């Protein structure tokens, strides 16, 4: 419920997604009474989950029966600067997948500052030659002894597009071992054998996980850099 500019972070995120005009329906699913009451008061579409889930994807799976779409987006509430073009690219992944082979897609952005590579609050992803995720980690992957950018490092952005079936299977599986260690929900899909198509976006984005992130985001907002 921290403020970004004059609005809460979750409200900024909701309005960014709403203003993209890409989705048939937008809904916040939360287990926080504070967030529920805040969004309900301003007439935003919000559902309350009484169940304590380990991650947002599990909450969405719980409420997925309320939505008709075969493709469901999970946009984490701490992504107020989400890139519309990145969302369009994720939609196009499924539009172009005529054989329905891709079950999950997500966003990544290049890391240009080595401090971010070594920052455990930033989730890194390594990919194969077809842009499918090999692994996600809070650690530096791949590790470089040179302590500088010597590889195309990518930061994972907290946005997923999923087919309904994969979402349900994710929830049925329950928390997996590597997911528990890293505290990264995307790893559960990998441990289940799913391939995650990663889409690159060059748009500057800040996931607000810490007070320092919030300060940086407010500064960029004031200077209208984002």
Which residues are covered by each model-predicted region?
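Short glycine-enriched, charge-decorated loop/helix-capping segments at active-site entrances
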Residues: 1-5, 47-49, 175
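N-terminal glycine-rich phosphate-binding loop and ensuing alpha1 helix
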Residues: 1-30
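Short, high-confidence coil segments that cap the C-terminus of an alpha-helix
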Residues: 23, 69, 99-102, 194
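Hydrophobic/aromatic residues located in beta-strands of well-ordered beta-sheets
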Residues: 26-28, 72, 105, 133, ...
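Short phosphate-binding loop-to-helix
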Residues: 27, 33-92
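A conserved hydrophobic position in a structured secondary element of the catalytic/binding core
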Residues: 30-31, 82, 162, 209
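Conserved core of the sugar-phosphate nucleotidyltransferase
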Residues: 82-173
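Conserved alpha/beta core of the MobA/IspD/sugar-nucleotide pyrophosphorylase nucleotidyltransferase superfamily
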Residues: 151-226
């Amino acid at each position: 419920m921290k403020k970004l500019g004059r609005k809460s972070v979750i409200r900024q995120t909701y309005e960014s997604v709403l203003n993209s005009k890409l989705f048939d329906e937008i809904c916040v699913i939360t287990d926080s009474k504070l967030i529920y009451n805040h969004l309900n008061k301003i007439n935003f579409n919000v559902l309350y989950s009484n169940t304590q889930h380990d991650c947002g994807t599990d909450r969405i799976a719980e409420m997925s029966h309320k939505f008709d779409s075969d493709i469901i987006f999970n946009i984490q509430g701490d992504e107020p600067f989400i890139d519309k073009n990145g969302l369009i690219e994720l939609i196009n992944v499924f539009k172009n997948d005529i054989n329905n082979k891709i079950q999950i897609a997500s966003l990544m952005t290049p890391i240009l500052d080595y401090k971010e590579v070594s920052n455990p609050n930033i989730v890194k992803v390594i990919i194969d030659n077809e842009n499918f995720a090999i692994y996600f980690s809070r650690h530096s992957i791949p590790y470089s002894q040179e302590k500088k950018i010597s590889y195309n490092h990518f930061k994972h952005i907290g946005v997923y597009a999923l087919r309904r079936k994969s979402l349900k299977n994710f929830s049925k599986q329950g928390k997996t071992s590597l997911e528990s260690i890293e505290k990264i929900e995307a790893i559960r899909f990998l441990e289940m054998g799913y391939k995650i198509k990663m889409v690159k976006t060059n748009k500057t984005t800040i996931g607000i996980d810490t007070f320092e992130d919030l300060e940086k985001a407010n500064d960029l907002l004031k200077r209208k850099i984002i």
